[in-house]
């Protein structure tokens, strides 16, 4: 699987650029704020329909333009394919095309161009808030399981509606009459998310432990624990059981949610912990331990996606190697000898020998 070429129009700081890529390593070089990360964002968005930076689609449209266009040619699933996204500066919905045919949802292009992004912020993912860790799992699962993507979208839609009910009920108490209906549906969809996440994190933890053991020489025991609502004693239980578990938890917090006007419990609060030989990295891990564990998680994510899809996903390393010491740099580079890789950096140095070099300056290829 590899991205053969991409064309960007009015995307971020790119007015119009066409790029051909190597099926192996592509080194994207240039000073800061020239468009290197924008290019990786375009590649990631092409395959997933999700941005790792923008909160709104309009943020990706070049200033002064009405629309942005991202189009790529991919060799995947043993044939050439094309993907295209048209993003609009306003409320008009985006458009998706696969092999020239218009599609309705991002789930219809899942698996064509899966990507794994690794950026400097990910090095501290085990120290930051739970939302960042949830995004790690969600990004992978949405690409692996189109049904998960649909369930997550539905869950967030219901959660938003429930939040409005809780906020507006002070002025309109009758809204509370429909709250149980929303709680039931929220728990049904939330149970699906927990079921998917439990299996994903179980596999991710086992794979990450392998990579961590290779780097540390087995000196530390890596363990990952998925954490969801307290009434879920077995996240691998049938979805019907998980639904009831979530309903029980919501019943306990029903009055508190009404009083605070907040959705206090559910899979939108999920998290995971990583420990080394029983020591929780979130609370006690050193910078070196935390970075090595984060690297292991990203390599594990790539391995899992490759195993499930039969082809390795495209790896996007956004200025992350410069944040690592030589030992960790070598460890990462030794693990990515296969598949397509994009590496951004300001000073290419020792990396120029890895593959094709593309220099970016102010949204143009030099």
Task: Please identify what each model-predicted range represents.
Residues 318-320:
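Walker B catalytic acidic pair
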Residues 35-36:
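Conserved lysine of the Walker
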């Amino acid at each position: 699987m590899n991205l053969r070429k991409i064309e960007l129009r009015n995307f971020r700081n790119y007015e119009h650029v066409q790029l051909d890529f190597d099926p192996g390593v592509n080194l994207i070089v240039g000073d800061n704020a020239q468009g290197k990360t924008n290019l990786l964002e375009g590649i990631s968005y092409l395959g997933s329909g999700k941005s790792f930076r923008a909160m709104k689609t309009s943020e990706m449209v070049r200033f002064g333009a009405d629309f942005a266009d991202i189009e790529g040619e991919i060799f995947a699933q043993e044939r050439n394919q094309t993907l295209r996204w048209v993003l609009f500066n306003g409320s008009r919905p985006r458009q998706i095309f696969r092999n020239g045919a218009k599609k309705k949802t991002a789930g219809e292009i899942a698996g064509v161009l899966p990507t794994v992004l690794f950026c400097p912020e990910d090095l501290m993912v085990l120290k930051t808030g739970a939302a960042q860790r949830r995004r790690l799992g969600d990004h992978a699962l949405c690409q692996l399981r189109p049904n998960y993507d649909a369930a997550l979208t539905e869950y967030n839609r219901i959660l938003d509606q429930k939040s409005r009910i809780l906020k507006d009920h002070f002025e309109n108490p009758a809204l509370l009459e429909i709250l149980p209906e929303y709680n039931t549906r929220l728990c049904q969809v939330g149970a699906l998310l927990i079921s998917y996440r439990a299996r994903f994190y179980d596999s991710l933890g086992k794979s990450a432990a392998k990579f961590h053991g290779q780097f540390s020489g087995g000196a530390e025991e890596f363990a990952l624990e998925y954490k969801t609502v307290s009434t879920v004693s077995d996240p691998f239980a049938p979805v019907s059981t998980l639904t009831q578990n979530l309903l029980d938890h919501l019943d306990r917090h029903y009055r508190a949610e009404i009083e605070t006007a907040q959705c206090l419990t559910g899979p939108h609060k999920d998290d995971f912990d990583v420990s080394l030989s029983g020591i929780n990295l979130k609370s006690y891990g050193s910078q070196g331990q935390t970075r090595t564990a984060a690297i292991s998680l990203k390599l594990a994510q790539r391995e899992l996606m490759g195993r499930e899809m039969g082809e390795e996903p495209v790896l996007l390393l956004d200025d992350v190697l410069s944040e690592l010491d030589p030992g960790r740099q070598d460890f990462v580079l030794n693990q990515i000898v296969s598949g397509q890789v994009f590496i951004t950096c300001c000073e290419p140095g020792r990396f120029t020998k890895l593959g094709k070099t593309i220099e970016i300056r102010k949204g143009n290829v030099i």
